[in-house]
Structure formats: C-alpha cells, structure tokens
C-alpha cells in the first residue's frame, strides 16, 4: 500500500512526531493508521522512560470548579523549563488533568494517573505521549479536591504559578475570591490558632522565652513579653490573624465576621515549592532543548 502525504499529515497531527518518523511507522504497519499510532506510542513510551528521572520544577497550577460551586480541584503539573510550561500542548494537558481530578474519585496521584483522560487512554498514557512529543519530563505532582455541603468553593489563580481553593460558608462569590487572593499573596499556614501544631507553638515559645529572659527583666514582665510575641506570631501565620491585603487596617478575621462568613479550609499550591531545581545556565538550557528536538 502506498503511503500518501495525507496519511503522513494525519499521523503527524495525532502524534506530534516528525514527518520521517510518521512515514516510517506507516511503512512498517502497511499504511494502517491505528497500528502506526500504536507503534509510535510504544516507541514514545520508550523515549519517555529515559526522561522520567529528570528534575521537573517548572510547570503550572490549574484549577476547576463545578458549575454549582460545590466542588473544585487543583493540580500541579510540572515540566523542566518555563518555555515548555507556556506551550499550548502543555497548557491543555495540565487543564485536562484538572478536569479529570474534579470528575474522578481518585484519592492519590497514582489513582489520578490511572483515570481516563480520553477514550482508550489514561492520564499517565497521555503524559508519556507528551514526554515523547515535547522532549521533557512531565510530572503530575499533586492535586487536591474540595467539596462543600453548606458553603461554596472559591478559587484564585495568580498567573499560572500560584493557585488557591477556599471553602467558604456564608458571604458571596466576591468575598470568596478576595479571601483566595489574600491566601495566594500572604501564604498563611492555617485558618486559625486551632490549626497550628502544638509543637510549633512550643518551639516558638521556647525561643521567645530565651530572648525575653536575656533582657534581664522580672519574670512577670518576661511572661507578658512572651505572650505578646506569641500573639504576634499567630497573627502572622494564621489566615484570620493576618491584615487583609486589600485593606490592611482590618484583619481577615474581622472581614469575615463583618460578612457573617467563615473559612472552613483552604489549599494553596505554588509551582516547584519544595523541589530542588538543578542549576542550568541559559546556554545549556537552549542546547538541551535543541538536542531533544
């Protein structure tokens, strides 16, 4: 069977591979398009596995909220370079992962990867195809899904690198967005004092006590100094204690109280946080992309 230019074009569109690779696959499969796709997927998986150990610390945060605002999902999908993170293929893949995360009942990344992204292909299979096509390691690092019976889920994305989900009871959509925006900017550790681990407070109290005692002041004064510093510390790390970014004269707690609302929980993702990125200069990064193409 002769291999036509149209067949090669269609295979290129479906696989994102080069013209010669597509023509070779079609020749090897006797012009069977589906068999050629399968062959190239197998070849792509082999290439993908070689790249799967490389550090992927760039990427984007994507979020999806249900139409009724009762559920939402947020995901972090990583790649190796900012260049790839801005590409249409990667953007679509990351957004599709968020859609799968919202629709599925997956509890772990492994379960999410095993979920169906399109007919006949799991998230992980599509991920591996992306690796073969783009030439960089791609990793679905983490996700969270929130649902609310009594309130709503608000979301906020600061560009593509920071994302927040907030479960809010009371208030309106605008308040939810404002609170999510505040969390993106101020990075609170938890909602309120109840969420601060006891060991964290104990450690800070020990440090503040040592500092206060070094002042040589009486014990009762030292105790008040420590209490004051602990209060300030809690105000800095808890959502309700922080000055609201759009109106620093009031705390987030006071704002919520004035609106008759409360925050049940929140999730904040930032691209690459906690990942040790390999140092690569610009020239080396360009050369790496050229070699992979």
From Swiss-Prot:
Region Involved in Mg(2+) ion dislocation from EF-Tu: start-end pairs: 81-84
Family matches, as PANTHER family: ELONGATION FACTOR TS, ELONGATION FACTOR TS, MITOCHONDRIAL
Keywords, ordered alphabetically: Cytoplasm, Elongation factor, Protein biosynthesis
Pfam family, one: EF_TS
Official protein name in the record: Elongation factor Ts
Family under the similarity heading: Belongs to the EF-Ts family.
One GO location term (cellular component): cytoplasm
Main location: cytoplasm
Protein's job: Associates with the EF-Tu.GDP complex and induces the exchange of GDP to GTP. It remains bound to the aminoacyl-tRNA.EF-Tu.GTP complex up to the GTP hydrolysis stage on the ribosome.
Location in or out of the cell: Cytoplasm
GO MF annotations, alphabetized: translation elongation factor activity
């Amino acid at each position: 069977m002769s291999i036509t230019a149209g067949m090669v074009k269609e295979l290129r569109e479906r696989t994102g591979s080069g013209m010669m690779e597509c023509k070779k696959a079609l020749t090897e499969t006797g012009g069977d398009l589906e068999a050629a796709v399968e062959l190239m997927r197998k070849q792509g998986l082999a290439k993908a596995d070689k790249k799967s150990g490389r550090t992927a610390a760039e990427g984007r945060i994507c979020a999806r909220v249900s139409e009724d605002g009762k559920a939402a999902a947020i995901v972090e999908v990583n790649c190796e370079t900012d260049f790839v993170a801005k590409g249409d293929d990667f953007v679509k893949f990351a957004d599709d992962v968020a859609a799968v995360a919202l629709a599925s009942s997956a509890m772990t990344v492994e379960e999410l990867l095993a979920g169906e992204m399109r007919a006949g292909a799991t998230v992980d299979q599509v991920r591996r195809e992306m690796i073969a096509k783009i030439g960089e390691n791609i990793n679905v690092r983490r996700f969270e899904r929130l649902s609310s019976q009594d309130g709503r889920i608000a979301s906020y994305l600061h560009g593509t690198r920071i994302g927040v989900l907030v479960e809010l009871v009371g208030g309106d959509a605008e308040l939810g967005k404002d609170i999510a925006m505040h969390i993106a900017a101020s990075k609170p550790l938890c909602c309120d004092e109840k969420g601060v681990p006891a060991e964290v407070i104990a450690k800070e109290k020990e440090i503040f006590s040592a500092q206060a005692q070094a002042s040589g002041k009486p014990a009762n004064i030292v105790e008040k100094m420590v209490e004051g510093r602990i209060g300030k510390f809690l105000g800095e790390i808890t959502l309700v204690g922080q000055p609201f970014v759009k109106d620093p004269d009031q705390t987030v707690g006071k704002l919520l109280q004035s609106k008759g609302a409360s925050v049940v929980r929140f999730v904040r993702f930032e691209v690459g946080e906690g990942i040790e990125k390999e140092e690569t200069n610009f020239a080396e990064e360009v050369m790496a992309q050229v070699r992979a193409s």
